[in-house]
Regions:
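ABC family nucleotide-binding domain
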Residues: 1-163
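Nucleotide phosphate-binding site architecture
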Residues: 32, 68, 87, 124, ...
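Helix N-cap at the start of a conserved alpha-helix in ABC-type nucleotide-binding domains
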Residues: 166-168
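Helical segment within the ABC ATPase nucleotide-binding domain
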Residues: 170-183
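Internal alpha/beta loop-helix hairpins
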Residues: 181, 186, 192-262
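Glycine/charge-rich catalytic "coupling/switch" loops of P-loop NTPases
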Residues: 249, 254-304, 329-359
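OB-fold (S1/OB) nucleic-acid-binding surfaces
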Residues: 259-262, 314-320
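Short aromatic-glycine-enriched beta-strand elements
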Residues: 308-312
Length: 359
């Protein structure tokens, strides 16, 4: 397996800059997810690893070797696409063995390798079938097995689960993670789905579009826990997490901000500012007990009952706030006046101007 390194990489198409000043390393054997909204450059970055998108600036290395101008065939990579790219007139076994046949390997060798790859992804009983007789999840497993047969240094996944329904996506997420653990392979995985990013990656690269005014694409690179619990900036705070983080801008008075009747003492980096942006995850807001005068007053505007939990949208003097909590006890009614309290240990603070995290 091989590490992948980006050093100040830029990618442009004509006068349009799509990726700017990208520096990150995918360690040997690591599973890294590139996640972000449309236009953030995630698929372009993946294509640059494969040699399908030209690098305009900086260096990209695979296994320590500079690959900017290397032919795609020499890069020792395998790619799994959103579309399965299977030959419809061939059986699963023929689809899997096609590349080996083109390379001139012996029939017995091809049969043995195909059987091994099919067993790895649970397709041993489907080798005689054509793609039209398979489910979406099974077709994606064929594509994965075909990548396995290349024995690459790096696996690339370009939104491979986007065409699957929710049940198959959940199952395939687990299968790909199990495959990574069993192979110890270096993997780079592109998705717009933060659930996939949070549940699959050893590390996550959160990317933003340059067209939105960002100076560079990479907003944060870290473990799922780091990205969720310590977002580096307001973009990451808003992008990662469902429902989205509550964000309000508050004046600083005497080194503190007020959330209704609650006072939150700021660290020195925030206490000297005129105002700060406060972020609070919906699960870290709580409904105060009845007749309590603590916190912020709000009115229940909307209730989503998910069975095991509730998501409440509340109208407050600070604007709409969303609360997420396990369903227990009495559920407030629409229009009911309630009080919200926040957990001061779970507060996120951001500079209003730079939108960077305040520690």
């Amino acid at each position: 397996m091989a590490a992948v390194e980006f050093q100040n990489v830029g990618i442009s198409f004509g006068e349009v800059s799509v990726v700017r000043d990208l520096s990150l390393t995918v360690a040997d054997g690591e599973f890294v997810v590139l996640v972000g909204p449309s236009g953030c450059g995630k698929s372009t970055i993946l294509r640059s690893i494969a040699g399908l998108a030209a690098i305009s600036a900086g260096d990209m290395r695979i296994g320590g070797t500079r690959m900017n101008d290397a032919d795609p065939a020499t890069r020792d990579i395998a790619m799994v696409f959103q579309s399965y790219a299977l030959f419809p007139h061939m059986t699963v076994a023929q689809n899997l063995g096609f590349g080996l046949k083109i390379r001139g390997e012996a029939k017995a060798t091809i049969a043995a390798k195909v059987a091994e790859a099919a067993a790895t992804v649970g397709l041993s009983d489907h080798l005689h079938k054509r793609p039209g007789a398979l489910s979406g999840g099974q077709r994606q497993r064929v594509a994965l097995a075909r990548a396995i047969l290349r024995r690459p240094g790096v696996f690339l996944f370009d939104e491979p689960l986007s065409n699957l329904d929710a049940e198959f996506r959940t199952a395939m997420r687990a299968e790909i993670v199990r495959f990574h653990r069993s192979q110890g392979a270096s993997m780079v995985y592109v998705t717009h789905d933060q659930t996939e990013a949070m549940t699959m990656g050893d590390r996550i690269a959160v990317l933003a579009p340059l067209a939105a005014g960002h100076k560079a694409n990479l907003m944060q690179y870290g473990t799922p826990d780091e990205v969720y619990n310590r977002p580096a900036n307001l973009f990451v705070a808003r992008f990662i997490g469902t429902p989205r983080m509550n964000v309000v801008t508050l004046p600083v008075e005497g080194g503190a901000i007020r959330f209704g009747s609650q006072s939150i003492i700021l660290p020195p980096a925030g206490a000297c500012l005129a105002k700060v942006t406060l972020g609070q995850r919906p699960e870290h807001l709580q409904l105060a007990p009845e007749r309590s005068d603590t916190g912020l007053t709000g009115s229940v505007e909307h209730i989503e009952n998910l069975g095991h939990e509730m998501i409440l949208t509340l109208a407050t003097e600070l604007g709409p706030l969303v609360l997420r909590q396990a369903r227990s006890g009495k559920v407030p009614a629409l229009g009911q006046s309630v009080r919200l309290t926040l957990d001061p240990d779970q507060v996120h603070l951001f500079d209003v101007s730079s939108e960077q995290r305040i520690e």
